[in-house]
C-alpha cells in the first residue's frame, strides 16, 4: 500500500512540476518525465520518479569537479557569510586572488606565456563579448577601418549579439535578422596557404580572429596544431588580435590546463576566454589578455555589475587550485583513454554506423552515420545521460572527477544503447 501511495504522490508531483512549464519561456526542449533534484559527483538523482542517472554531461562540461562538490559547497557557505557582492567600484580580496591565480597557473602549465590581465564576468558569452570588444578597440586604435572579426564555420561562441555574430550555425543566427557587421567566416579545414590568402585580403578591415582550439558544439573537432600555429603567424603579420575560446575545452577538459597548452608559445593567443568549469556550476567567467591588449584599454571601456564578485571568485580560486595539478590532469587523460579505447572497440563492432572517434582528455566525440537521438534516448532510459554535438556526434564530457568504475558502468550502458538501436 505504501508503494502505491508513493507512486500516486510522485505522479501528482511530476504533473504539478510539468504544469509549471507554462511560466517559463519556450526556449528549451526537455524530456517531461525527468526532474533532477540532487547530485553527487557524476550521479544525478530524480527523486520525483525515484531514478538515478550516471551523468556524462556535467551540465554541458560545467561541473568539472562533480555535482554537489562538498568543498565547493563549504567555500560558498563560508564566503556567503562574509561577503557575496560589492560591485567593481571597490577591490575585493577573492577577485584579486583569482586574477593572479589564473595568470600564474596559466603560465606554469604551458598556457598563454605572456598572460598578464584578467577581466572577470559571469558567463562564456560575456567573456567572449569582452574579448571581441577588446580586439575591436585594439583594431580601431590602429586604423578606423580595422573593426571586423574573422570567425570559422562550425563555430559556437554564445548567444548574445556579439558572440552570436561570430557563431556560424544559421539555426542560432537567422531568427534574429541583422547581427553585428564585419564578420567573415572561413573554413578551418582549408589549407594554410588558402587561409593566408583570405586573411591577407581582409587585413585592412580586421581587428581580431576568434577560434575554438577544440570545436565543441560543432561536433568535438580538435583543430590541428599546425593550423593554429599557422593562423597565429598570419595574424601577427597583419596585426590581428587572436582570441582562443576555451569556454568548453579549457580548465583541464582537454587533459591539459588549457587546450592551447598543447601549442608552442609562438601560437599562444593574445586573448583567451574561460567559463563553464571555472565556477563548477556557479556563474563566473574570465577573459585573459596579454599586455599588448590591456595597454589599449582605458577605465570605462568595459564593465560588469556582478563580475568578480567575492562568492564566485572564491569558488573559482578553489577550482583552479584543484585542476592546476599535474596529477589531476594525468588522471583526466587516463579516464579519457578509457573512453576512447572502449569506443574504438565498439566502432569495430559497428563500423558502418560509428564513423569517427575524436577529442582530447575528457572531451570526446563519437560520430555516427546519422543523428544519434535514438541512442541518447535509449541511454537515458537505461540510466545514462549523454548529449549530442553537431548533427551526428555524441559528446562525452563527464565530470573530470568521475570514478573509473562509474565510467565503465556508463560505457556499458552506452554500448547497450548502441546495440539496441543497431542490432
UniProtKB/Swiss-Prot annotation:
Any coiled-coil regions, as ranges: none
Location(s), subcellular: Mitochondrion matrix
EC class (word): transferase
Catalytic activity reported: N(2)-acetyl-L-ornithine + 2-oxoglutarate = N-acetyl-L-glutamate 5-semialdehyde + L-glutamate
Cellular component GO terms held in the UniProt record: mitochondrial matrix
EC number(s) on file: 2.6.1.11
Keyword flag Plastid: no
Keyword field contains Transit peptide: yes
SUPFAM superfamilies cross-referenced by the UniProt entry: PLP-dependent transferases
GO molecular function, one term: identical protein binding
An annotated GO BP: L-arginine biosynthetic process
CDD domains the UniProt entry points to: OAT_like
Cofactor: pyridoxal 5'-phosphate
Domain of life according to the entry: Eukaryota
UniProt pathway: Amino-acid biosynthesis; L-arginine biosynthesis; N(2)-acetyl-L-ornithine from L-glutamate: step 4/4
InterPro entries: AcOrn/SuccOrn_fam, Aminotrans_3, Aminotrans_3_PPA_site, Class-III_PLP-dep_AT, PyrdxlP-dep_Trfase, PyrdxlP-dep_Trfase_major, PyrdxlP-dep_Trfase_small
Residue list for modification N6-(pyridoxal phosphate)lysine: 276
Keyword entries, A-Z: Amino-acid biosynthesis, Aminotransferase, Arginine biosynthesis, Mitochondrion, Pyridoxal phosphate, Transferase, Transit peptide
Family: Belongs to the class-III pyridoxal-phosphate-dependent aminotransferase family.
Record PANTHER family: ACETYLORNITHINE AMINOTRANSFERASE, MITOCHONDRIAL, AMINOTRANSFERASE CLASS III
NCBIfam families hit by this protein: argD (TIGR00707), PRK01278.1 (NF002325)
Full protein name: Acetylornithine aminotransferase, mitochondrial
Species for this entry: Kluyveromyces lactis (strain ATCC 8585 / CBS 2359 / DSM 70799 / NBRC 1267 / NRRL Y-1140 / WM37) (Yeast)
Amino acid at each position: 500500500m505504501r508503494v502505491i501511495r508513493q507512486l500516486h504522490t510522485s505522479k501528482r508531483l511530476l504533473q504539478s512540476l510539468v504544469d509549471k512549464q507554462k511560466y517559463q519561456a519556450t526556449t528549451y526542449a526537455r524530456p517531461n518525465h525527468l526532474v533532477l533534484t540532487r547530485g553527487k559527483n557524476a550521479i544525478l538523482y530524480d527523486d520525483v520518479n525515484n531514478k538515478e542517472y550516471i551523468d556524462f554531461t556535467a551540465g554541458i562540461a560545467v561541473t568539472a569537479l562533480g555535482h554537489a562538490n562538498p568543498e565547493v559547497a563549504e567555500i560558498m557557505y563560508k564566503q556567503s557569510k562574509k561577503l557575496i557582492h560589492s560591485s567593481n567600484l571597490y577591490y575585493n580580496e577573492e577577485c584579486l586572488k583569482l586574477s593572479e591565480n589564473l595568470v600564474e597557473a596559466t603560465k606554469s602549465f604551458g598556457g598563454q606565456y605572456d598572460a598578464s590581465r584578467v577581466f572577470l564576468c559571469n558567463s562564456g558569452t560575456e567573456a567572449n563579448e569582452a574579448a571581441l570588444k577588446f580586439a575591436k578597440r585594439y583594431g580601431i586604435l590602429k586604423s578606423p577601418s580595422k573593426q571586423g572579426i574573422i570567425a570559422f564555420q562550425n563555430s559556437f561562441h554564445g548567444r548574445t549579439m556579439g558572440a552570436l555574430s561570430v557563431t556560424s550555425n544559421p539555426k542560432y543566427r537567422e531568427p534574429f535578422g541583422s547581427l553585428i557587421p564585419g564578420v567573415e567566416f572561413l573554413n578551418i579545414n582549408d589549407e594554410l596557404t588558402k587561409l593566408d590568402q583570405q586573411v591577407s585580403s581582409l587585413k585592412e578591415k580586421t581587428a581580431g580572429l576568434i577560434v575554438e582550439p577544440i570545436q565543441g558544439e560543432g561536433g568535438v573537432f580538435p583543430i590541428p596544431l599546425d593550423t593554429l600555429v599557422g593562423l597565429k603567424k598570419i595574424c601577427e603579420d597583419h596585426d590581428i588580435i587572436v582570441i582562443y575560446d576555451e569556454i568548453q575545452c579549457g580548465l583541464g577538459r582537454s587533459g591539459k590546463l588549457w587546450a592551447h597548452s598543447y601549442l608552442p608559445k609562438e601560437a599562444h593567443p593574445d586573448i583567451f576566454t574561460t567559463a563553464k568549469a571555472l565556477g563548477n556550476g556557479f556563474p563566473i567567467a574570465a577573459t585573459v589578455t596579454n599586455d599588448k591588449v590591456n595597454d589599449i584599454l582605458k577605465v570605462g571601456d568595459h564593465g560588469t555589475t556582478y563580475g568578480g564578485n567575492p562568492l564566485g571568485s572564491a569558488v573559482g580560486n578553489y577550482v583552479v587550485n584543484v585542476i592546476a595539478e599535474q596529477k589531476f590532469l594525468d588522471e583526466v587523460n587516463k579516464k579519457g583513454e578509457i573512453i576512447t579505447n572502449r569506443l574504438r572497440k565498439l566502432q569495430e563492432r559497428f563500423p558502418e554506423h560509428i564513423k569517427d572517434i575524436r577529442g582530447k582528455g575528457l572531451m570526446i566525440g563519437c560520430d555516427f552515420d546519422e543523428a544519434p537521438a535514438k541512442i541518447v534516448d535509449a541511454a537515458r532510459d537505461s540510466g545514462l545521460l549523454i548529449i549530442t554535438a553537431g548533427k551526428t556526434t555524441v559528446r562525452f564530457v563527464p565530470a573530470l572527477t568521475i570514478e573509473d568504475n562509474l565510467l565503465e558502468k556508463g560505457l556499458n550502458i552506452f554500448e547497450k544503447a548502441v546495440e539496441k538501436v543497431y542490432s
